[in-house]
Each structure stands twice: as C-alpha cells, then as structure tokens.
Amino acid sequence: MFLIYLFVQTAESSWLSKTAKKLENSAKKRISEGIAIAIQGGPRRRRFVAEQDAIHSRVSREVPTLSDSV
C-alpha cells in the first residue's frame, strides 16, 4: 500500500511540476512578445476584449436618443 502511495505521489508531483513549468514558459513568452511589440511601437494586443465597433453599434441601438423620447 505504501509503495502505491509513493508511486502516485511521484507521478502527481511530476505532473504538477510539468504543468507549472508550462505555465511559467507561457507567461514568459507573453511578456517577451509584449516587450517586443512595445519596442517596435505597434498597437497593444488585448485579450478577450470585444470589438469596439460592435459595442458602439449595440449601445447606439439600445440607448434612446432625446428626439425619440419627446
């Protein structure tokens, strides 16, 4: 029973360390890409932000103007 516990513990810690390393590498890659874009002077990329035109057209349809309410 103890040997099975040790085996599972080793496998789990190995998986956790690999996952943590992947997350760390992903974060480093995103940071380096952001620095490269900033140095080149390009536009900043934002993650998970809706298109501004889509928001603007939706707001203009939903919000009544003053002439509509009079």
UniProtKB/Swiss-Prot annotation:
Induction: By bacterial infection.
Record's subcellular location: Secreted
PROSITE patterns listed in its UniProt record: CECROPIN
Cystine pairings recorded for this chain: none
Signal peptide region: 1-13
Keywords annotated in UniProt: Antibiotic, Antimicrobial, Secreted, Signal
Single biological process term from Gene Ontology: defense response to bacterium
Propeptide span(s): 45-70
Tissue-specificity statement: Expressed in the body wall, intestine, uterus and ovary.
Protein family membership: Belongs to the cecropin family.
Protein encoded by which gene: ASCEC-1
Purpose of the protein: Has antibacterial activity against several Gram-positive and Gram-negative bacteria. Is weakly active against yeasts. Acts by a nonpore mechanism.
Annotated GO CC locations: extracellular region
Name of the protein this chain belongs to: Cecropin-P1
InterPro entries, per the entry: Cecropin
Domain of life: Eukaryota
